[in-house]
Amino acid sequence: IPFAGRYRMVDFVLSSMANCGISNVSVVVRKNYHSLMDHLGTGREWDMARRHGGLNIVPPFAEKGVRIYSGRVEALSSILSFLEVQKERYVVMSDANIAINYDFNALLAAHQASGADVTVAYQKVEIPEGRKNDNYTLTVDADGRVTELLFNDYRPGKQNLDLDIYVMERQT
């Protein structure tokens, strides 16, 4: 998504990842991605132009017999063989439609300390009366564990909105 002329929303996430020392990034694309490929180029803008790791753009149909995906789980499934050959211990997933300067290192540390299978980043936000929430809303217990996940929640007041940023340990 274009932002302020020459930038795109993906630039915020990539810059945050680069600033946290993440040097192996794969952008999983679905459709109409030619201009995105032109924009990202080799990844040099984020110091990710490398022979090993760096910035990878993973188009749909990269694997034989894989159909275009419709959600995050299908996207991961479609790149499973790609993920299996990576050497990094953790996978950080983030949508690229958010203007954010995010500390992925803090999220990774929280994930490691929690012992959870998946750690999700969320933000407490005030939802006005009558406004439909198009994000996932999380209910968390006293230990910070997600106990409920709602979509299109209509409840007003303070809500925990999913930022669509996740971290998990890769199974080897």
Where are these regions (language model features)?
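Unchanged
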Residues: I1-T172
